[in-house]
Amino acid sequence: PRPEVETFLKSLPFELTGAQTKVWKEIEKDLGSEKTMSRLVQGDVGSGKTMVAVLSALLAYGNGYQTCLMAPTEVLARQHYTNIVKYLKDTGVNVSILTGTTRTAERRQVLADLADGKTGIIVGTHALIEDNVVFSRLGLAIIDEQHRFGVEQRSRLWRKCPDGVPPHILVMTATPIPRTLAMTLYGDLDVSVIDEMPPGRKPVQTIQITERKRLHLYQFIRDQIAAGRQAFIVYPMIFINDKVDYKNLESGYEEVVEAFPFPPYKVAIVH
């Protein structure tokens, strides 16, 4: 590995898990080959996907290339940005963020630094594929939850390489996908799985229930609240949309308030 990566790994206050190391070696091999990497990294929340992404970006930086990390929401983008800045604070890598709410003056500076090559890593949302976003030397594109981005959106990002050569692609997902299904959905991607949690991390349980068991779910939430915990209910839509039959926050909030009346429950809404 490049000295930047070796130095960084030695500076970490923890060791990578066996699964992280295995996946990192696969990525490192891809980046060191003559072919363009196209790899999917799958792992539960907290399994350490971001660290693998940071190592990949650091390797690209050491070779003189820029990295962009595109997330589907501003909240997730800022979370990635905060973590990456924390990890790389002593490396000299300039990390920037660009979202739809970035103020004009700040946006102008971010775009200038990106085009001049001063920015090594940029994190953002769909704002990264706008026409005025120009890279100096994009070498690695990391996409979190690729299924939330359309084909055209992704291809617009690829076209931002000045020399016309597509960047290496690293896709991250926390969605549990059986390998056979992954081959169908992401047939063009090699698949790596981080199937081990760092020491001290509790495993994440993913449970799917049907609509008819919603009352059982509400009772489970009441039990968790009684135990001193909190519950977050996430909706794919904010308002009712006649074009798609998705649950929405507007009507869902009313339903939740009815199921969890005040007092003793306190229900808040944010979007």
Predicted region positions:
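Inter-lobe coupling/hinge segments of SF2-like helicase ATPases
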Residues: 10, 14-25, 32-271
